């Protein structure tokens, strides 16, 4: 029997969401938000968090910086029951990614600093770990700049 129900490889970052902004974002002006929240972001991490919260056994592989955003991202996943033992923490000048969402009444701007998201590479992955599940999930491949050329090799080898 596989160790996990689902293993996931992908991006890991937090979302900073600002609410109550004016409809027009004027240049060179400080704009005041009514409220904000800092929450787990990135589609792969949100899927992992939600599946684990529903009782699935979830293994997660990604890359974060050795910084506050990376530690907080890992904490949030671990609190929901996601196995984060294979997330690589790197000590480099590249920090953990962050998405800033400027929420307006009827629309939003989404700004992402890629950081370590783009640097997730083939060498960061443990293929045996990923294959030890009933289902493998990969998300946001367009953001995974380093891994993208080798994704075709990853998918056939990940079948359980």
Give names to the regions the model predicted.
Residues 1-14, 76-89, 102-160:
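Ribokinase/PfkB-type carbohydrate-kinase core domain
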Residues 1-63, 68-82:
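Glycine-rich phosphate/adenosyl-contacting loop at the front of the ribokinase-like
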Residues 63, 89-90:
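Proline- and acidic/polar-enriched loop/turn elements at helix boundaries
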Residues 94-96:
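Short acidic/glycine-enriched loop/turn segments that link adjacent beta-strands
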Residues 99:
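Conserved beta-strand and immediately adjacent loop positions that scaffold enzyme active sites
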């Amino acid at each position: 029997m596989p160790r996990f129900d689902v293993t996931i490889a992908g991006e890991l970052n937090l979302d900073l969401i600002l609410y109550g902004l004016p409809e027009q974002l004027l240049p060179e002006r400080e704009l005041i938000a009514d409220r904000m929240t800092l929450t787990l972001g990135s589609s792969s991490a949100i899927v992992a968090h939600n599946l684990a919260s529903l009782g699935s056994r979830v293994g997660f592989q990604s890359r974060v910086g050795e910084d506050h955003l990376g530690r907080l991202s890992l904490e949030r996943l671990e609190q929901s029951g996601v196995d984060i033992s294979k997330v690589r923490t790197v000590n480099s000048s590249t920090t953990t990614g962050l998405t800033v969402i400027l929420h307006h009444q009827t629309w939003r701007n989404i700004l992402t600093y890629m950081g370590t998201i783009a640097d997730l590479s083939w060498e960061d992955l443990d293929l045996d770990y990923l294959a030890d599940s009933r289902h493998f999930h990969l998300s946001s491949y367009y953001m995974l700049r380093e891994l993208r050329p080798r994704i075709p090799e990853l998918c056939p080898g990940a079948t359980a």
